[in-house]
Amino acid sequence: MITTEIKRVKNHINGEWVESTGTEVEAVPNPATGKIIAYVPLSPKEDVEKAVEAAKAAYETWSKVPVPNRSRQLYKYLQLLQENKEELAKIITLENGKTLTDATGEVQRGIEAVELATSAPNLMMGQALPNIASGIDGSIWRYPIGVVAGITPFNFPMMIPLWMFPLAIACGNTFVLKTSERTPLLAERLVELFYEAGFPKGVLNLVQGGKDVVNSILENKDIQAVSFVGSEPVARYVYETGTKHGKRVQALAGAKNHAIVMPDCNLEKTVQGVIGSAFASSGERCMACSVVAVVDEIADEFIDVLVAETKKLKVGDGFHEDNYVGPLIRESHKERVLGYINSGVADGATLLVDGRKIKEEVGEGYFVGATIFDGVNQEMKIWQDEIFAPVLSIVRVKDLEEGIKLTNQSKFANGAVIYTSNGKHAQTFRDNIDAGMIGVNVNVPAPMAFFAFAGNKASFFGDLGTNGTDGVQFYTRKKVVTERWF
């Protein structure tokens, strides 16, 4: 339930809400107003150790619960999430800033991830081949791996945690969750509803905090696997540190997603698609379109319509239904984004829509409006770096081949999109683009939960992505059994 009082956030360990043993706290502001809504503890190593001990103890019994029973328990959780959709969306808007429309969409995507986890009896089925030799049968069995952990970012405080702990727990593991200290309130509510669904204590533990919690998770010998979503430098660190300590790690990292706009595209739908991908959720998502490679033949017409439509977007508090672009997560991030816009201007890009000049309209809060640059090239930082904001760069290319070459020159390879009505163009794009997730006339090619989610190159560190069969493989270990009876 959302209240106006300033909340002091707690950890949840072994089925109970407990104060952190540390003394450091961090203020949590509403990004739309700058007003403090909570204080979150920056928990020390000792809190992580307690959470791991609780999860380790719970694993002894939870791992032996029949898979259909685990699935039924998750159905109860799923029902509670569905019953509380409106409240969950409001919490997201309050602490993250994204519009209520975007938050509602996130809630639904999170629920879909739990729906996947409820199908654990099917997902965990092994394989068998009788009579592999005279009187000998062979089979593969799947088992949980133990205590696992998830480290999640601020930009999807519901969806990304729900990619992780429901599926891991459905597979028989127990879980330690560390969500972003910037969005702790939604994590609290997810855990509350989890235990309302009747799960045994210690199956899910929540430790709030910052880098000390991350390091403690990566170094703890009893944690078998770590799932991470965040920026490229931190993802690289998590992967290298976690694997050095003998853990399985999946680390989903940064992005610089390109969209190629062909002359044969549906212009109206393409413009609206690019706007939605680039500027919804204030551009704070790893699947946002941040570069458009538009073919010269249609470039002027496309840009004219794009700029005109973008200038209609309203910026402001996400609770106001007319607003399309909400605030950025923190003042420090806003200043970073303004620095990138200034660098684009200094490097010679043409600023077609300037999102810096909106303070008079929106007042306090960490707002940057939709921003569009033309004349961008690969030497500019606004093309190279993940800005994580409503900032769109346009690069003009002569044809599809040049657009693909441009896209593949990025160090990131998370998602990529083509807008075209030509099947051959789409096929060429699909076969030659280097990205983990590809869209053809699909604005944000983030797959449904029953498919794996992962990029390539500097967008992903690991072997198995989240969700789908990749997720099941990540959270389980195999035993190959060869048997003969006399």
Swiss-Prot record:
GO terms for molecular function: malonate-semialdehyde dehydrogenase (acetylating) activity; methylmalonate-semialdehyde dehydrogenase (acylating, NAD) activity. InterPro entries: Ald_DH/histidinol_DH, Ald_DH_C, Ald_DH_CS_CYS, Ald_DH_N, Aldehyde_DH_dom, MeMal-semiAld_DH, MSDH_GmP_bac. NAD(+) binds at residues 154, 178, 181-182, 231, 386. It catalyses: 3-oxopropanoate + NAD(+) + CoA + H2O = hydrogencarbonate + acetyl-CoA + NADH + H(+); 2-methyl-3-oxopropanoate + NAD(+) + CoA + H2O = propanoyl-CoA + hydrogencarbonate + NADH + H(+). The keyword Magnesium does not apply. Keywords: NAD, Oxidoreductase. Its EC number is 1.2.1.27. GO terms for biological process: inositol catabolic process; thymine catabolic process; valine catabolic process. It is an enzyme of class 1 (oxidoreductase). Belongs to the aldehyde dehydrogenase family. IolA subfamily. This is Malonate-semialdehyde dehydrogenase 1. It comes from Bacillus anthracis.
